[in-house]
Amino acid sequence: LNGKSAAMMLALSLVNVTAAFAQDDNSSAKEEGNRNVMLNAASANGPREIQIGLPSADVNVLENGLPVTYATNPHSVNTIWRGDASLSHQGLLKIAETAITTGNIGYAVNSFTQKGQKGFNGTLNYKSNHFGLQEFSLNMNGDLGKDWYYSFNMYQDFDPGTFKIKSTPYQDRTQIYKALLTKKYNGNRGEFTAMYKYANSHNVYNYATQSAPFIYVGDGSVKEYGNFKLGTTSYLPIDNEMTYHDMRTGELKQTSLYDACLNKASEVTLMNNYRFDNGLNWKATLKYDHSRGAMVYQTPMSIVDLKSDANKGVYNYMYRDIDGAVKAYNGQYVQTRMSCLNAGKIDEALFTTELSKKFSTSTFRLGVNEWFYHIDYCSNTTMYDQSVPADGNYALRIWDANKRDSYFYDFNKNASEYYKGSENKLALYFTHDWDVTNKLNLYYGARLEWQKLKGENAAVKNAKGEFVGRFADYNLGATAADGTKIAPADLSYNWLNYDFSVAATYKLTDNFGFTGDFTYIVQHPKFEAFAPATLPNTDKISVPLGRAGIYYNNSWLSLTSLFSYISKTNNNSTLNLQHGSEIKAAPLTYDIQTWGWTTDAVAHPFKGFDFHFLFTYQKPTYKKYETSITFSDGYVGKINATGNIVAEIPQILIELDPSYMITKDIKLWTSFRYFSKTYANINEAYYFNGHWETFGGLNWQATKRLALGCTVVNFLNQTGAKGSIAGAELITKDEAKGIK
């Protein structure tokens, strides 16, 4: 069950600036505007995902032209990057630019670190809210003489979240430090920068805030369960300790959830820019990162109704009170959870270099990526049960005395993962932005990439050539029921990936014209796709994206309206299907396609007032989505979702962003985002009604050096649920008809 945070939030930010910062040269042709990517209802300090008609994915983030992290599992972006005072520029790369320069799908946040400038300069950002958030961001930079410059950055986040949890005082405790030394040389035509970054983050919010119990009414709405308040009540058990079975050694170990989600990174980055006499520009950036990445999940699996006729006398749940005495649990419901402790030791070396030159009517760019990634990763899983408190109190861990005498069971049985080795990508790409005539602009580019993957995983086969799958107490060195010894399986793949993109804009008149673009991306699975108990489909993944439409510009209005098509083949996924109290993993490969229409407008109807409007209608559907799994009692769970609307993706998206300058120093703004009905399971049996996300604020440039801001999140005070309903994957429309 996924609960939608619905609390009213008030934030205050303060900025002290002693000098204007220079901004990196970033062509507007590469970036989107008007998207407010850092205005995120799901996170106080991370970028939001922008829908492109495909299932949810992590936001791509670049810093100084390189990915902040090569793979977001287990090292998420938000643990090593923040949109803070250390950045001189933040933008949003277009889909085509992201595809050509990185080989990835979707938009990408494009950021650059603040380098030293002449004189002494500083920025201090402070943000707080009525829940107790304390966030500090400091940049100090200046020159040392003889063309040497320095820049120091510190970020500190103490975020208790929107509700209290017992396991830790903070849902986000992050600290990031950066130090840069820059030397300009050869008459300022060249610039060399060395940067060191250290990050330490506990991303508790990833497991502490992602689920809640509620009553599904049947009409797309939900009711709160008892006194459990959605968005303000913690559904996490009081206990912070977790027992797990080490996937690598088989040892039984214990850790705290807070310690398990520790992320650390130590990075060295070297950057060189040089402008030749003939107008040629050369950029080169090299980054080495040694880190520990971690993602902890406490995934709700199923809810058991102890008071139902079928379950009376079947279970005997117990708990320990504050004195340690064992007592019977008399609640109506039991929540089963799967704890996933994902962690990996990471070494990555990323190098990108580009040559570019501006001509009278065009700009040409040639680039090379050499990206190396090494990881030793595993996910240790543990099952446990907890109470479902109707009184709004904290949940307790409980156990079924008829089956066991401790909280934890089925170690590594359901979704445990292991892989170790390296992935290397060597790519050559080019782009050409060309004003063919004063009416026609062409942008085109291509990327050719060699992907090499070598290592080992735990997709083990038996003597019959069948995958063994996971079982209780699974680890490397264990023996399966059929006698198969669990030993690492070697992996070795070499693939050729390629992308190309072309965009055209034709001015029919000074104000009106036609625009269109087409991007085609060919990928193969990343290393993380080899984590489960079976091998993924290693066929090529194709993503064509085409858009075509019109634009209109005048002195007060800028409007674009486009029809679009996007599809993706060979999506690898694993479903945890539930039948009774049994949970089994079902791997599958499927396709997706989405048709859509988007209209985007920015208006300035009168002095001081700006208005941004975005409307999208899209129809994302599954293709070739079929799988089945046989449970221990012989029941065969089948899913055929071909033709269904993709779960968790809305068909209508609306963004409204009005703002008004009350005076030349005071700005009043709001932002409204509407997400229409989304399906909560693959069979379209359950759905959630549409909802609004709302933001509003007042910004005041009090003096030349002081800016104040006040922001309110969710001022419409909407509550409800979004995402999926745990354990509902096999429920059909007919079975859900009678729910009220």
Tell me the role of every PLM-derived stretch:
Residues A22-P67, K94:
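Extracytoplasmic beta-strand/coil segments of soluble accessory domains associated
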Residues N60, L93, A108-Q114, N121-H130, ...:
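Predominantly transmembrane beta-strands of Gram-negative outer membrane beta-barrel pores used
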Residues T69-H75, I80-T123:
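A beta-strand signature from Gram-negative outer-membrane beta-barrel systems
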Residues N121, D147-Y150, G187-F192, G279-W282, ...:
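Repeated loop/turn-to-beta-strand initiation elements of outer-membrane beta-barrel proteins
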Residues P169, T182, E191-T269, A294-C340, ...:
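Acidic/polar loop-and-plug regions of large Gram-negative outer-membrane beta-barrel proteins
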Residues T255, D539-A548, A601-F606, D610-H612, ...:
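Conserved C-terminal beta-signal and adjacent last beta-strands/turns
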Residues I346, K358, T363-Y373, C378-T382, ...:
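Structural signature of Gram-negative outer-membrane beta-barrels, strongest in the C-terminal barrel
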Residues N438, W556-S558, L562-L577, A585-I682:
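Gram-negative outer-membrane beta-barrel transporters
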